[in-house]
């Protein structure tokens, strides 16, 4: 692995660690909100449906996938900018995209993009149209189902050359 590829993988690793740390921070915050006294504690949760918790986790997942997409786009801008510096350096870095670990990463990134897209469309629909709790739950289930189905299909396409 060349020095440029090592630098690219190092920066990608730092970005992935920052996304994971952000995810841990967001999940920790959601758990603290869930267990706080302001939320009514366990007594307050007795009469409440679980939809509110599911919506909160969808919100956390939306934030985490947004952070992951932003981190990748930032890195991708820099790796495409290498073309202005030297085409050999650009080709050197882009050889990494054909490796099996990067194909797995691209597959996960594609699933993050799908979830972020479908959940974002769901949130826009919830803001624009005053739908009820049942419809909101169905929309979330639909966005998760679409993410799983389309994510599996795209993963097969992305991972096939690496297998």
List each model region and its residues:
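Membrane-embedded alpha-helical bundles that constitute the cytochrome b-like, heme-associated redox core
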Residues: 1-163
């Amino acid at each position: 692995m060349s020095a440029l590829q090592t630098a690219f993988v190092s920066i990608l690793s730092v970005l992935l660690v920052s996304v994971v740390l952000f995810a841990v921070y967001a999940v920790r915050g959601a758990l603290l909100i869930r267990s706080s006294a302001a939320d009514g504690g366990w007594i307050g949760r007795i009469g409440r449906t679980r939809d509110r918790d599911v919506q909160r986790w969808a919100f956390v997942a939306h934030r985490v996938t947004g952070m992951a997409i932003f981190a990748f786009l930032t890195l991708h801008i820099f790796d495409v900018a290498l073309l202005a510096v030297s085409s050999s350096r650009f080709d050197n870095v882009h050889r990494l995209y054909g490796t099996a670990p990067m194909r797995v990463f691209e597959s996960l990134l594609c699933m993050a993009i799908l979830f972020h897209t479908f959940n974002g469309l769901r949130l826009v629909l919830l803001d624009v149209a005053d739908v009820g709790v049942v419809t909101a739950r169905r929309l979330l289930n639909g966005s998760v189902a679409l993410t799983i189905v389309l994510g599996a299909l795209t993963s097969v396409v992305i991972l096939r050359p690496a297998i």
